[in-house]
Amino acid sequence: MEGEMQRHIKLTKAQTTPVVLVVGDPGRVDKVKVLCDSYVDLAYNREYKSVECTYKGQKFLCVSHGVGSAGCAICFEELMNNGAKVIIRAGSCGSLQPTQMKRGDICICNAAVREDRVSHLMIYSDFPAVADYEVYATLNQVAEELKVPVFNGISLSSDMYYPHKIIPTRLEDYSKANVAVVEMEVATLMVMGTLRKVKTGGIFIVDGCPLKWDEGDFDNNLVPERLENMIKISLETCARLAKKY
């Protein structure tokens, strides 16, 4: 029903646009909305904050999903229940290729390693996490037109943020396997998108390198211009896809 509200994101079908930009941090929703032509605040419950954005005449939502696969899966499920057709995640990441990708660089991901938990409860572990090609291609096309250099590659989506001593992380192994970046949610999004026939993709800005944390290679106070570049690529991509879906 149009008026039925989803339990956690507190949005109805009537409020949910076909194209949605998702971010982890509710505070980043505020950074996104001020770059739009106009916006309307919609809801804020738990980690799920939502805004209707208007950018270049096109309407789409920006919604925060919090940290980690379980919480973000709730957000994605409820958006899909409400009829979302395209969901793009824009967030921060760590570089697993520190000689190539430095703090402030942008990576558009074509696939992800499923080191989450929730997607394995949805479908077999052999099932791939891949971006929709149209979303991936549009993100890259927009970046090229805006003259913003970007990297492409695979993301490791891991439920582990702080490493522990008993079981070592696999970061070094995935780095050697040429995985580009590490974050926490896009694999879940990609798997859910494929299962639900929803187009998905991911774009990320590097805030450091977890392979070099002991050397102090981390700073989430990202250069505003670099962060704004990632947001502008995301907004333009959402606007273009909103014309079609």
Curated annotation (Swiss-Prot):
GO terms for biological process: inosine catabolic process; purine nucleotide catabolic process; purine ribonucleoside salvage; uridine catabolic process. The active site is at residue 207. A purine D-ribonucleoside binds at residues 8, 184-185. SUPFAM superfamilies: Purine and uridine phosphorylases. InterPro entries: Nucleoside_phosphorylase_d (IPR000845), Nucleoside_phosphorylase_sf (IPR035994). Homohexamer; trimer of homodimers. This is Purine nucleoside phosphorylase. It comes from Plasmodium vivax (strain Salvador I).
